């Protein structure tokens, strides 16, 4: 499959640079040290975010025009980090997240999650407004 390279690239991008950059961002571990790009292993947070935005700009899915497991994995990162505020709210990221969440399987999964949470609430859920 000619898309295999892109598929593998984005699976590993999500697991490596994206996750590391977002966790460091969440923990406030940003460095102004000029050596940061080589020490951190992914460049800068801005480079990671810009790389992802460039890849998603103008495409429906990360491997082009068809949905793949790479979208499930990368999309879960995008959706989670948008919700947490660690990934900046940019139109490209929001459009991608919205496309993924509008898929029939995502809608069904969310309904199942909601039903399970109602049947098995966890302590403190009421205080969270859920």
Residue ranges and their predicted role:
Residues 10-102:
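GST-like fold's C-terminal all-alpha helical module
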Residues 113-130:
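Acidic/histidine-enriched, glycine/proline-rich intrinsically disordered or flexible terminal extensions
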């Amino acid at each position: 499959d000619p898309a295999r390279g892109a598929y593998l690239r984005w699976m590993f991008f999500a697991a490596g640079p994206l996750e590391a950059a977002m966790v460091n961002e969440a923990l406030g571990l940003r460095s102004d040290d000029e050596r940061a790009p080589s020490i951190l292993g992914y460049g800068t947070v801005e480079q990671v975010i810009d790389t992802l935005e460039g890849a998603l700009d103008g495409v429906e899915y990360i491997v082009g025009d068809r949905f793949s497991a790479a979208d499930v994995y990368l999309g879960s990162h995008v959706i989670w980090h948008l919700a947490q505020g660690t990934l900046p709210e940019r139109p490209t990221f929001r459009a991608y997240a919205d496309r993924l969440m509008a898929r029939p399987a995502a809608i069904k999964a969310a309904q199942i999650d909601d039903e399970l949470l109602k049947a098995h609430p966890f302590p403190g859920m009421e205080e969270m407004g859920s």
